[in-house]
Amino acid sequence: MRKTIILFIFLHVLSYAFPIYFKHIGMKEGLSQLSVMSIYQDELGRMWFGTEEGLSVFDGVHVTTHKPTLKNETNKETTVGNSIDFITGDNQGNIYFNSDNSLVQYNLHTQQFNSLKQSGVTAVAFGNDRLWV
């Protein structure tokens, strides 16, 4: 009987749990496209979305879309492909993603894109303090 009362009280308390917070983010809020291929949350709590129209980041209030550009040998900016299939990070201020089979790094501190590998990248992940390509 005592176990039944404790179970009843426990279930009653659980029924008053707080509702789950959910915010829909779409094109109206600034997302570049509705088809999201990958999602990553960085160490600052921002959400990164890889779409076929670029890299979008949600800071809790606004969505900003990046069309990644790299500087070549002559310091001229060239656009990286827009389709972002995989995103990951190392919790040290770097976001890694693949775009058109190349590996790109985005530094959160300098806000610059760096090309790490030009071709042959189909997926990217971070684990055991290593970047897996």
Describe these PLM feature segments:
Residues 1-133:
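Carboxylate-rich, polar loop motifs that coordinate divalent cations or form catalytic acidic clusters
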